[in-house]
Each structure stands twice: as C-alpha cells, then as structure tokens.
Amino acid sequence: MTISIDKSVKKAEPSIFDLCDDWLKRDRFVFIGWSGLLLLPCAYFALGGFFTGNTFVTSWYTHGLASSYLEGCNVLTAAVSTPSNAMGHSLLLLWGPEAQGDFTRWCQLGGLWTFTALHGAFGLIGFMLRQFEIARAVKIRPYNAIAFSGPIAVFVSVFLIYPLGQQSWFFAPSFGVAAIFRFILFFQGFHNWTLNPFHMMGVAGVLGAALLCAIHGATVENTLFEDGDAANTFRAFNPTQSEETYSMVTANRFWSQIFGVAFANKRWLHFFMLFVPVTGLWMSAIGVVGLALNLRAYDFVSQEIRAAEDPEFETFYTKNLLLNEGIRAWMAAQDQPHENLVFPEEVLPRGNAL
C-alpha cells in the first residue's frame, strides 16, 4: 500500500507590520528602518526651520534685533531667535491662539524657534535609535548609541530644560553662532557658570577626550607601518607596504617608557576613550539642569567678606564676581528691554574701572 504525504505547508499571509518591516529594513544606499520614520522627517523640518529663519525671519518683534541674511547679517550673526518673554512656555503652534494660522505672525512671534528646537530634539533621538537599530541588524553592541546620549543630554538640557525652569523660552539660546556666544555670557553673568563643578567636569571630559583622541590616533599611526631608513620621517613610513605592522605590544611598550604606565588591553583603552567624553557631557547636562532650578556655583564667602572689608585684598575669584556684576548690569537692561530696568550711572561699569 502506498501512502502519500502532502509536504506542502501553507504559510501564513504576512501582516502589514511584516510588510512594513521588510520594506523599511531593505538593503539600500541609505538605510531607513523604523528609526527613520522619526529621524528623517524631524531632521528635515529642523534643518528647514533653521535655514528659513536664518535667511528670512527677523528678531525685531522678539529681541529688537536684526537676525537674518535678508537684513544684512552674515553666517556668524544670523540666528533663529527665541520667542519673546511674553509668550511664556507656549509651544507656539501655527494653529494656536497666538498665531491663529497666520504664518507671517507665527514667524514674527518666534514660532520657528520652538519648531526647530522640538523637531531637532526628536531628530537627535531618532539618530540615536538609528544607531541602535543598525547595531542590532549587523550584530554589534550598541555603544555608539550610548555614546550619542551625551550630545542629546546637552541639547535637551540647554535648549529645553533650562528655559522650562526659567520664565519662558526667551531665556534659551537662539540658534546662531553669535547668539550662542551671548547665551554663554548670560550663563556666566547670571549663574557664574565657569565656577560650577559640573561645568568643570564637562570641560575636563571634552578636553580630556580631545587629548586621548590625539594620543590614540598618533600611537596607532606610529605602529601601522614599519619604519624605514630614510632620513625624512614622512618618507620613512611606506603606506604601500603589503601588510600593516600594528602592534598593541609595541604601543604598550612605548607608553610604558613615556609615563611608566600604559593600557593593558584594547578593550579597557577604548572603553576609557568612550567613558571620558560621554561622562563629561552628561555632567555638563546635569549642571545645566541645576541652573534651570537656579542652583548656585561655588561660593567662597570668606573671600567676599574680606574683599569688602579690605580694599587691598582681592583674588581672581572676587574680581570675577565684579565682572559678573558688570555683565548683569549691562545685559539685563539691553537683553530684557520689556522689563524697563534702569540702573543709575554710578553702578554701571566704565572702561577699566573693573
């Protein structure tokens, strides 16, 4: 007796999710992925808002300033400025009660700033998710995405959390080079930011990372190629040699002779290079969150009291406090004209009086 077995297995119809997943993760020149659904439109709108504001939109109604190429600014002085203080923390939606669907009025009120800031934040988050997604696809660990959390933390703390802790979006940085410089001066004058321990950790992390990057790049470059006999150093390294001669042992021996210590293995070396800048950025972001709550930096009150009592006693610290007072006196009246702040002539710093 012959028994026939039907081996055909009926496959389930792919769901809409499966079809979308297949299309999004298809191998193409520019990977899209699920993260691309967040990244690509947000990055497009953020960059579009930035370039539109820089090119066409004035800050006359929000800061009393010219801030566009159309008004005569250049690439360093143009900016997408924050909304006026009167707008508070409104999202300034185009269809909201402030602009009421009027695009021109929306631009005048500073709507492009909230548009750019929010789309920029979600665009950065989308880029981090993109790194997670591709790392999973090619089966590597997601340390790139974890490292990118540092820039995201700084952006969100400076552009979103800090102004949320203050009166309004007005106190956030505008999107422009000179505008960021003004914001840095504001941070110093009103928060004594350079004496904040979190700022110190941030500087140590960023500059330390630059030093580590330079040392690491030079060391690897030094050991990639075999040294030759030519008198000229650059002729001695032959980039056309058949094999690289990179050696962790050689590099370890070099730095052991230089410093007396060296990294024992590649994993610890590269984790340290990851840890230093990311921790620095996170510490800086935490410090900015503290400033949003108006937490103070270091105060050396004993020096302040002695400087007030003894005209011959002055330190760099007390001198910096005087400079901060000057920044506040000049900047508050000019930067917040709506407050109608008036300072008597005798309290304003003049020339080299500081």
From Swiss-Prot:
Q: What are its E.C. numbers? A: 1.10.3.9
Q: What class of enzyme is it?
A: oxidoreductase
* InterPro entries, sorted: D1/D2, Photo_II_D1/D2_sf, Photo_RC_L/M, Photo_RC_L/M_CS, PSII_PsbD/D2
GO annotations under biological process? photosynthetic electron transport in photosystem II
TM spans (from-to): 42-62, 126-142, 154-167, 209-229, 280-296
Q: Which residues bind Fe cation?
A: 216, 270
Which residues fall in a coiled-coil region? none
Extra remark beyond the main annotation:
2 of the reaction center chlorophylls (ChlD1 and ChlD2) are entirely coordinated by water.
Q: What is this protein called?
A: Photosystem II D2 protein
